[in-house]
Regions:
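Hydrophobic core
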Residues: 12-18
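Acidic (Asp/Glu) and glycine-rich low-complexity loops/linkers
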Residues: 5-8, 19-130, 136-148, 156-165, ...
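Short, surface-exposed interaction patches in beta-rich subdomains
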Residues: 157-162, 172-273
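Histidine-centered metal-chelating micro-motifs
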Residues: 134, 154, 193
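N-terminal secretory signal peptides that target proteins for export/translocation
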Residues: 1-2
Length: 273
């Protein structure tokens, strides 16, 4: 009897260890150009061929991970019935490795982290982080690029594009290092921050709240600033600056613009750096 109990205990232990061991699975999915990552963990994205999706983690967790293509979007998420309390520590993280030929959209929802392992060459692209996650990519886009953050997460994007739009809502951050041949449009609502360097033909900036747009190292020909609240803007402008402040916000500028238009209702001010 004791021997049977011992054998049963060993079998149970082996079964438990098997579920706790790290394993890899290759998922077969249809063609996609967009990726949505909605689980705790890390995702590494490479642009190339052939298309490949590999997930790594504990076996008991991997069986709850869904990798479905909706239209042109690969969605990586858990089953709706998943008990998030089981995701206790770093050992429970899922790691995803993706190789894909064309990329025009990347998004992170929740606390995940997305890392671009290669430069992404594309036409237009949309980048988005919602929650406390992060994204770090290098992109060469011949068209338009968007990089938005909602929540406390952050985006770090480098490269070049025709136009760039970034909206940060909440306490998140966008770090931007881009050569922009056309217009850059920065918007912050809340206490978030945009840090930018590089160049752009023109810049539009709007802040609602206590956020910041720190772009003293972003060279531009003209800049339009609108602040409502206590937000702060720094910019490097060559030709024309137009700033309207409602509240206690401030605008600091580098360069020697030939034309500076400013108006303030409140204690806000516009000054040279």
């Amino acid at each position: 009897m004791k021997k049977q109990v011992l054998i049963l205990s060993i079998l149970m232990l082996c079964s438990f260890l098997a579920t706790q061991a790290q394993t890899k699975e290759t998922r077969n999915v249809s063609t996609f150009t967009k990726i949505s990552f909605r689980v705790p963990g890390k995702i590494y994205v490479r642009q190339g061929s052939p298309q490949k999706v590999v997930i790594e983690g504990k076996k008991e967790i991997l069986k709850e991970i869904e990798t479905d293509v909706d239209g042109s979007r690969l969605v990586i998420e858990t089953d709706d019935k998943w008990d998030w309390n089981l995701w206790k520590d770093d050992d429970d993280e899922v790691i995803v490795y993706i190789t894909v030929k064309d990329i025009d959209g990347l998004s992170v929802g929740g606390s995940g982290d997305l890392i671009g392992e290669t430069k992404i060459i594309t036409d237009d692209i949309n980048l988005n982080v919602s929650g406390s996650g992060s994204m770090k990519v290098e992109v060469e886009a011949s068209g338009d690029m968007e990089g938005d953050v909602s929540g406390s997460g952050n985006i770090d994007v480098r490269g070049k594009c025709k136009s760039f739009n970034s909206d940060v809502s909440g306490s998140g951050k966008a770090i931007v290092s881009l050569s922009i041949s056309g217009n850059a449009d920065f918007g912050v609502s809340g206490s978030g921050k945009i840090e930018a360097d590089g160049s752009a033909s023109s810049v539009k900036t709007s802040i609602s709240g206590s956020g910041k747009v720190l772009a003293a190292n972003l060279e531009t020909n003209s800049c339009e600033v609108r602040i409502s609240g206590s937000g702060d803007v720094e910019i490097n402008v060559k030709n024309e600056l137009d700033a309207i402040i409602s509240g206690s916000g401030s605008v600091r500028y580098k360069g020697n613009p030939s034309k500076v238009n400013s108006a303030s209702s409140g204690s806000g001010n516009v000054r040279k750096l």
